[in-house]
Amino acid sequence: MGDISAATKAPAPPTPATPETNTTSSSSDTDVQHEPQIPSAASRNLVIFALGLAILVGVLDATIVATLVPTIADDFHSVDSSAWYGSAYLLVTGATQPIFGKIYSTFQSKLVFLSSVAILEVGSLVCALAKNSPTFIGGRAIAGLGAAGVISGGLIITALTTPLKQRPVYTAILGSLEGVGVIIGPIIGGQIASSIGWRWCFWINLPIGAVLCAILVFCLHPPKQTPEREQEQAGKTWTQKLAQLDLEGGLAIAGSITCLLLALEWGGTSYPWSDGRIIVLLVVFGVSLICVAVHQHWKGEAATFPTRLLKNRTFSMFLLCGLCFAGAQFTVLYYLPMWFQAVQGVSAAESGTRLLAMVVSVIVVSVIAGGSAGAVGYLPPFVFFATIFSSIGAGMLYTLHPSISKSKWIGYQILFGAGSGTGIQQAIVGVQVAVDHDDMAYATSAVMLVNTLAGSIFIAVSQTLFLGEMKRVTELIPNLDRHTLLSNFRSIRDKLDHQELDIAVNAYNRGITKAFLIGLVLCSITVLTWPLIRWIPLKKTEDPVKSERRNDPETLNAGNVA
């Protein structure tokens, strides 16, 4: 514990001598962070409440269908297309994140956010009224588009409307709601479907959306753009602003991401990784990614994502932190309920309840760390904390076995949740602090995209290791087919003799703990970012990036570096 304390309480070192690449071409002594224009604390709290509610609705909409799929597929008599009930939403949400970064940087954030909520509500309405599977899938895709704007927009607006030193705690609160939505979505969906019908899972979004829109219309007054950006946009018509969106680049990025997500969704489950369809998707993704990168670099400031931001060392390191912490957390959240059900033989509902230790840890520690970061004035100490605690927690989860005590798996969850939850929130705030005010939307959408892709990528990697163990089980127990083993193992536990059950349970345990090993590796990688993250102060009302740039002699001598 002494080492942990030393790591989290280390004094802030002087500004590193090695400069970072500047994210802007000029700076002025008059450039300041735009202070919130919310007139009162009550109004601000209402706005944060509405933004949090919107994010929660967006995340719940993604996870609530997990327990509804069999019921909806039965109603529509369309089992073959049921996999798209969840995938359509997630694919569109992930693929359109970069586009919304460009939209938020071009148009007024309040208008874009309210429009995103409206799109999400339209998608929910289509799902609630759907008479067949294609209509329902279309509604899910529409809702996913709205959710992309809502989830990233909530964090962007929070960054624009809260003082810099208070931003970590507000971001932690909103980010914690995402974790809550992931856990409680399937539980709420099952309860609503069994009591009043699955369509009410979507009807209920409409009054919630109306309430939060009313709050934001009257209480949200986000700051205007910087004078430079206002001058740049002055006199431009809507048509000219739409032309700025780099639609061809945005669509190319969305297409490339869609190919990757489809390959990860289908690979190893619907089709083997060696299947031609999976190979084609991965090849198209790789080629299109190279083409998109060249196109975005060539477009410069007109691109969907300005590639110059990647030259900012602190921004890139916080992106890496987001990738690692989110990848680890998604992997654990995906496989830990499976461990409870398959290895310990509990129900799906009970496995969700057993995750509460991690959920509470993520919420409580993330909020405390966010408030502490604002008080301390620097983010790096909390990245150290996140790396240490998440690595220890993931390492402990790797030691899970069928006869482990309840106190241990609860304690391991608390450690991992505290570290990974803090790490994800610090990454979100970190990318925002590392860039100038006008680049905040790009930075936020980038880290949200990275978080989304991390979950898909590392769950797929873990699944490959897991399926390898399952293959050995079917070889040892010939009468146990692979499909039943993977989809309905709990229901057949009583049909296996003692020896067969031991073989199957231990194989499940080995396969799932290998997934936790992936989480351990990811969390440990973040230690490499420690010496590379710049100690940017959070307590200044002035733009910290520009302030550091002016006060660093080497920066001034370098001209275009910070």
UniProtKB/Swiss-Prot annotation:
Gene Ontology MF: a single term: transmembrane transporter activity
Gene Ontology CC terms: plasma membrane
Compartments in which it is found: Membrane
Record field: transmembrane: 46-66, 83-103, 110-130, 141-161, 169-189, 200-220, 249-269, 278-298, 317-337, 356-376, 382-404, 414-434, 447-467, 516-536
Glycosylated residue positions: N22, N312
Pathway note: Secondary metabolite biosynthesis
Biased composition (Low complexity): 1-10, 18-30
Pfam family membership, one: MFS_1
Topology relative to the membrane: Multi-pass membrane protein
Renumbered residue ranges of the record's region Disordered: 1-36
Protein name: Efflux pump apf11
